[in-house]
From Swiss-Prot:
It is an enzyme of class 2 (transferase). The keyword Glycosyltransferase applies. Binds 1 Mg(2+) ion per subunit. The magnesium is bound as Mg-PRPP. The gene is upp. Belongs to the UPRTase family. It comes from Shewanella loihica (strain ATCC BAA-1088 / PV-4). One of its GO terms (molecular function) is uracil phosphoribosyltransferase activity. This is Uracil phosphoribosyltransferase. Its EC number is 2.4.2.9. It holds the Pfam family UPRTase. Uracil binds at residues 193, 198-200.
Length: 208
């Protein structure tokens, strides 16, 4: 599995700001979208382009445009919604596929509860977004579903990843790509990433 920890200074700075314990909901939400945007920039670097001729201000001009497979952005509910707008800045014509999965607080196992995927998944590149890759369960379940629907080109974008989650994801889906702003130290006994960001969903939506 290709794992990319994006070490751009802007990414490191913004993730550092997100770690503040008393960060406001507004600021956390803004930063989640901003880092999501920067991760998308990295994740789409291998997209192929083709030359086309358009009508410019002074006549025909040859330009490059993205070619090949269409894109679908797949936020994992609910926290993944916080990154979605940042991703769409770069791929505004992408279709949105939604997957609802929550983690059982006792077993730490993923529990699916909703799905609505774009059509023709076999023709699409999926950008799966979720702020935290902790145990990896939710991401693995989502990618299982995407593959069942025929999707073969999948990239996962997460703000923070735990080594345990990366190992689990690689074991389950060695053919995908993972882009993260930070590979953190470990999981604690409750399955939270350390140092992590806290509960990203609660911070994005202002709930507890």
């Amino acid at each position: 599995m290709k794992v990319v920890e994006v070490k751009h200074p802007l990414v490191r700075h913004k993730i550092g700001l997100m770690r503040e314990g008393d960060i406001s909901t507004k600021r956390f939400r803004e930063l989640a979208a901003e880092v999501g945007s920067l991760l998308t920039y990295e994740a789409t670097a291998d997209f192929e382009t083709e030359k086309v001729t358009i009508e410019g201000w002074n006549g025909p001009v040859e330009v490059e445009q993205i070619k090949g497979k269409k894109v679908t952005v797949v936020p994992i509910l609910r926290a993944g919604l916080g990154m979605m707008d940042g991703v769409l800045e770069h791929v505004p014509s992408a279709r949105i596929s939604v997957v609802g999965i929550y983690r059982d607080e006792e077993t730490l196992e993923p529990v699916p509860y909703f799905e609505k995927l774009a059509s023709n998944m076999h023709e699409r590149i999926a950008l799966v977004v979720d702020p935290m890759l902790a145990t990896g369960g939710s991401m693995i379940s989502t990618i299982d579903l995407l593959k069942e629907r025929g999707c073969t080109s999948i990239k996962a974008l997460v703000l923070v990843a735990a080594p345990e989650g990366i190992a689990a994801l690689e074991k389950a889906h060695p053919d995908i790509e993972l882009y993260t702003a930070s590979i953190d130290k470990c999981l604690n006994e409750n399955g939270y990433i350390l140092p992590g960001l806290g509960d990203a969903g609660d911070k994005i939506f202002g709930t507890k």
